[in-house]
Regions:
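Serine-hydrolase catalytic core recognition
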Residues: 310, 352-681
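Residue-level detector of Asp-centered blade-edge/turn motifs that repeat once per structural unit
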Residues: 43-44, 99-100, 143-144, 209-210, ...
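Hydrophobic beta-strand positions that form the internal "hydrophobic ladder"
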Residues: 48, 101-104, 145-148, 214, ...
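A short beta-strand motif characteristic of beta-propeller blades
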Residues: 27-31, 77-80, 127-130, 192-196, ...
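Short loop/turn segments that connect beta-strands within beta-propeller blades
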Residues: 70-74, 120-124, 186-190, 236-240, ...
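Beta-strand-rich domains and repeat architectures in extracellular enzymes and scaffolds
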Residues: 28-64
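A flexible loop/linker signature enriched in serine peptidases of the S9 family
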Residues: 52-65, 81-92, 105-117, 131-137, ...
């Protein structure tokens, strides 16, 4: 009996050990992951509200759920379940606390329109605070808690509405779009008051500390490229003519009053309007005057928040722009002092931070951070000690999955310039003579990049799912190299300008030097190479397979194959002028840098993926490249995703896109998972 008990115990221990082994990561695992899309600390600093986005395959949408957690730690609790968080195309709640902390505002659906809802923290039913016919795109409580300011489009003219109903409506391309207005409304009722003229398209705003004035940024037209044509104004909540605060060319946006009301901080390209211009941080007197640039380096500012003493500003740099070279894969929260512009990191380590907010006394700072191989969690930082506390674990199942090792790598390019990248290797792989099939993943942009995290390119795009399932590829035995060539983030503004009139030149050579380095180091098998990427990464993928036959498989998504297409057909066409001038001014260069010109050289089996309604990278380019390759007997397949834009937003399509990419590289490269499971070095 005793022997039987011992045998049973040993069997149970062995079984537990088997079940405890981490299992491989799959595409379906990627579709179960949750993302934190918004974080906001309460004014008293004692609670943090956040929203989690979850893919719902049954409904084919990404759903948002609101939670509240104590800043000192503990269990999160669900809030506001009666409010359906705005999720077109993805959850975008824009959490905002009232100044007394009694109400939590967010954007949710009222019918099919996004409106501002207030959720009482002391109990009671949620209620809609706005009833805009066109919905609300942004809002802010007034500091005194009496009013709400928000953005909404002008309503559709009655005649246009009639024409749309009877199918007689015609789109007049030169007709101005309806303006986005800044509106103010008292919380206790009353008629909303429009504060801005129909000639302005407002994109951001903030309240003055005394609740009497609103500062806002606006362009004279709408559209994607209008972000580089913004000015800053202020207007009284009682109405009247707007006052010009910053009047210069380029981007001037995200105005934020200092707590003492004397200054306005804003993001600016300092008089330049091309896409490569550094988005720095400036301050200007609240009533107008000469502005002053605080950051003299190449940091691109994303979000900002004043310290409560008005002496410094916290900000988040866009990925790879504040810390260059080996730190380019980080996105730390940074603090800059207004008096002399000195700046330093607030959050140390390999961290990628977003959605920062401060308590009313400035002692606590809440944010979303991606640390290690995660999708991000909620953290609270003690401003005095610099100690950060993790409050959530939104994807605990990651602890049961075998994840690859992600590390930064460096190599020398053709001109001896150091180029950096990230290298993902399979779980348990050790550099012991076993070469791996290598997939090169090209980032978008051109000014984009990679950061640390589970989906290295899309950690900065809230709840966006990567079309290339790098972690599932690692589990299938692939290594994935994510190069950061010049032209993208990490090398300053000069690095971005290095590819002007030269796409596919130095950037291509930087990438290929990385491939050669991985082969020379015994990591990559030179006979099992693949390449993939979307947007500019799609362009680079298409370009690579026209320049070399070294790759056995390629997948190009949302790609630019004929460079005249984005100028003539894209919503961002003017940005092509920044790189190549206009097509009739530089015809030879447009052709010389277009993959379509060299379609006859392609020998690599190519998968082309494109959203049917892509306005950024027109689908015409996918069709042209496909037809050119097909007519010449090349191995090519074209997948078109109905309703899809420049990226896909429907979970069913996202899953299929990932499956197709994994199946394509597996088919042509025929990877096998590593046989050994020795510890990674």
């Amino acid at each position: 009996m005793k022997r039987q008990a011992i045998a049973t115990a040993l069997l149970l221990i062995a079984s537990a050990a088997v079940f405890a082994q981490p299992r491989p990561f799959t595409v379906d695992d990627a579709m179960r992951l949750r993302s934190i899309v918004d974080v906001r600390i309460a004014p008293d600093g004692e609670r943090v509200a956040y929203v989690v986005s979850t893919p719902n395959l049954a409904k084919n949408e990404h759903e948002g759920a609101l939670y509240l957690v104590d800043a000192g730690g503990g269990e999160s609790r669900r809030l506001g379940e009666a409010v359906r968080i705005f999720n077109t195309p993805r959850p975008a709640p824009q959490l905002r606390w009232s100044s007394d902390g009694a109400l939590l505002g967010l954007i949710g659906f009222s019918g099919d329109k996004p409106q501002v809802f207030a959720i009482p923290l002391g109990g009671g039913a949620s209620r809609a605070l706005t009833d805009s016919s066109e919905g609300v795109s942004a809002f802010e409580w007034s500091p005194d808690g009496k009013s709400l300011a928000y953005l909404t489009r002008d309503p559709m003219p009655a005649e246009e509405e009639r024409q749309r109903k009877d199918k007689s409506y015609v789109i007049h391309v030169d007709a101005p779009e309806r303006a986005t207005r800044l509106v103010v409304k008292r919380i206790d009722g009353g008629t909303p008051r429009i504060l801005t003229p129909a000639s302005q398209y407002v994109d951001s705003f903030s309240w003055s500390p005394d609740s009497s004035v609103l500062a806002y940024s606006a362009a004279s037209r709408s559209g994607f490229t209008a972000q580089y044509l913004t000015r800053i104004y202020s207007v009284s909540v009682d109405g009247g003519d707007p006052r010009s605060i910053v009047d210069r060319t380029g981007m001037n946006t995200r105005p934020q009053y200092s707590p003492d009301g004397r200054m306005i901080a804003f993001i600016s390209t300092n008089g330049r309007s091309d896409i490569m211009s550094t988005r720095s941080l400036d301050v200007v007197p609240a009533h107008g005057g000469a502005s002053r640039r605080l950051l003299m380096d190449d940091a691109w500012v994303n979000e900002l928040a004043w310290a409560r003493d008005s002496k410094s500003i916290y900000f988040e740099p866009n990925d790879g722009t504040f810390a260059s070279r080996e730190h380019m894969f980080e996105q730390p929260i940074v603090r800059v002092w207004v008096d002399d512009g000195r700046a330093g990191r607030v959050v140390p380590g390999e961290t990628v931070d977003y959605s920062l907010s401060l308590s009313a006394d400035g002692r606590r700072l809440a944010y979303r951070a991606v640390e290690g191989r995660t999708m991000g969690d909620v953290f609270v930082l003690d401003a005095a000690t610099g100690r950060a506390t993790k409050l959530t674990d939104v994807n605990p199942e990651l602890h049961d999955l075998a994840l690859g090792e992600l590390k930064s790598v460096k190599w020398r390019s053709f001109d001896d310039m150091d180029i950096w990248g990230l290298l993902l290797t399979p779980p348990g792989w050790a550099a012991a003579g076993e070469r791996l099939p290598l997939i090169v993943y090209c980032h978008g942009g051109p000014g984009g990049g990679f950061t640390h995290g589970l989906f290295p390119q899309f950690m900065h795009t809230v709840s966006q799912i990567d079309p290339y399932p790098t972690e599932a590829m690692a589990s299938a035995g692939f290594a994935v190299l994510m190069p950061m060539p010049r032209g993208g983030a990490g090398y300053g503004e000069a690095g971005q300008r290095a590819i002007v009139n030269a796409w596919g030149e130095a950037d291509y050579r930087d990438i290929m030097a990385g491939v050669d380095a991985m082969i020379a180091r015994g990591i990559a098998d030179p006979d099992r190479l693949g390449v993939m990427g979307a947007s500019y990464g799609g362009y680079m993928t298409s370009w690579i397979v026209t320049q070399t036959g070294r790759f056995k498989a390629a997948s190009t998504g949302a790609s630019l194959n004929d460079l005249t297409d984005p100028y003539f057909l894209s919503d961002g066409g003017e940005f092509m002028v920044d790189y190549f001038k206009r097509p009739w001014e530089n015809r030879e260069s447009y052709a010389a840098h277009s993959p379509l010109t060299f379609a006859g050289r392609v020998t690599t089996p190519l998968l082309i993926q494109h959203g049917e309604n892509d306005r950024r990278a027109p689908i015409a380019g996918a069709w042209k490249f496909y037809r050119a390759l097909k007519a010449q007997g090349k191995t090519v397949e074209l997948d078109i995703y109905p309703r899809g834009g420049h990226v896909l937003f429907e979970p069913m399509q996202e899953r299929e896109e990932m499956r197709r990419n994994l199946a394509w590289v597996s088919r042509w490269i025929r990877s096998e998972p590593p046989k050994a499971a020795s510890p990674a070095h």
